[in-house]
From Swiss-Prot:
<dbReference type="Pfam" id="PF00363">
    <property type="entry name" value="Casein"/>
</dbReference>
<feature type="signal peptide">
    <location>
        <begin position="1"/>
        <end position="15"/>
    </location>
</feature>
<feature type="modified residue" description="Phosphoserine">
    <location>
        <position position="82"/>
    </location>
</feature>
<feature type="modified residue" description="Phosphoserine">
    <location>
        <position position="61"/>
    </location>
</feature>
<feature type="modified residue" description="Phosphoserine">
    <location>
        <position position="81"/>
    </location>
</feature>
<feature type="modified residue" description="Phosphoserine">
    <location>
        <position position="90"/>
    </location>
</feature>
<comment type="function">
    <text>Important role in the capacity of milk to transport calcium phosphate.</text>
</comment>
<dbReference type="GO" id="GO:0005615">
    <property type="term" value="C:extracellular space"/>
</dbReference>
<keyword id="KW-0494">Milk protein</keyword>
<feature type="modified residue" description="Phosphoserine">
    <location>
        <position position="83"/>
    </location>
</feature>
<dbReference type="GO" id="GO:0032355">
    <property type="term" value="P:response to estradiol"/>
</dbReference>
<dbReference type="GO" id="GO:1903494">
    <property type="term" value="P:response to dehydroepiandrosterone"/>
</dbReference>
<dbReference type="InterPro" id="IPR031305">
    <property type="entry name" value="Casein_CS"/>
</dbReference>
<dbReference type="GO" id="GO:0032570">
    <property type="term" value="P:response to progesterone"/>
</dbReference>
<feature type="modified residue" description="Phosphoserine">
    <location>
        <position position="80"/>
    </location>
</feature>
<protein>
    <recommendedName>
        <fullName>Alpha-S1-casein</fullName>
    </recommendedName>
</protein>
<comment type="similarity">
    <text>Belongs to the alpha-casein family.</text>
</comment>
Amino acid sequence: MKLLILTCLVAVALARPKHPINHRGLSPEVPNENLLRFVVAPFPEVFRKENINELSKDIGSESTEDQAMEDAKQMKAGSSSSSEEIVPNSAEQKYIQKEDVPSERYLGYLEQLLRLKKYNVPQLEIVPKSAEEQLHSMKEGNPAHQKQPMIAVNQELAYFYPQLFRQFYQLDAYPSGAWYYLPLGTQYTDAPSFSDIPNPIGSENSGKTTMPLW
């Protein structure tokens, strides 16, 4: 709108005659008052250089604002696309960490198996040595063994894992119960007969004993 007004004013200024018009019947020596007013009238303020510069600055600022808005929109679109790309990468990293690092529950089960193996339970002889070595290394805080995945150990323990815990799940609550599972090499002795049990021998003054009062 400002640009249109500026062009109209410039066109009007260019269309104005440079020299006063000589009317018929008037001598050049006696100018008309209206012509003098027209010639002597000051140049309109609208056509000054300062106003023209201000109008040009306003038009330039509007164009720069439009460009800034477009640049901001492009930046937002680029940031949203980059954030969408970053999200799946973080999810993949979490999934990889879950596969590599063993869970606390798994380590607890493994500790139970190794502890029960000390009681010479025959069913626990199938525990692989790799599981024992890995558990000891993780307890000592060796980072080389902690970074190794537990997939191989899980495959070794998969075939006997549920059956052992169904049979020995009570041993964790009652540690003394492990002593009831005797090793295979033990020999069972027969119980003594009633004839071998000696009769109790009492003193003669047993009937005269008095109990102290507390």
